[in-house]
C-alpha cells in the first residue's frame, strides 16, 4: 500500500532501521510549488524527485527505491542515488602520496580504487537535520585512516529544493590536517540516475 504522506508513496517504515548504532529514516522535502524529494540518510541517497511537467503533472524524474534494503544494495553495487566520497572516481592502483607518506586503499575495480572503495560515504549513515521544509542538512565525520584516507574530516551537505523547482547541493568539508598533509582536492559527488518520462513525448520544462 502506498503511503499518502508523500507523492511517491514511499512508506517511512521501510526506511527505519539501525545500522552500526545509527538510526536511518526517510526525509521529505517540499518547496512552495509542490515539488517534492524523498531522501534517506543512509548514503545520503535521493530516492525520488517529484517534479511538475509543463502541464503541472508531477512525475518522478530519478531512479529510486521502495525500501532501505533495496537502496543499500543498489548504492553498493551501482552507486545509484548515493553520495560518493571522500574521492569520487578511480584512484590508479589504489595508491597515492601526500608529502612523504604513501597511502594504500582497497582495490575494488580490478587494480584500482573506485569511488573510495566499499566503505565510502555511500555506505554510512549521515546525521540529518531538516531546518525547514525545503532543506535537509546532512553531516558526516570521517575519521583519520577510515577507508585508508588521511585526516579527520567533517563533511556538511545541504540539499535544497528551490522555489523555481531546482535541486541544489552545497558541500562543505573541514579537516584537522595542514593543507600539505591532505589530498589537495576532495571531489565529492552525488550520483543521480535521471529517469525522464517518455510517454507521451513532451517537453517537461
Q: What residue spans do the PLM features occupy?
A:
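Surface-exposed acidic/polar loop and edge beta-strand patches at domain peripheries
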Residues: 2-205
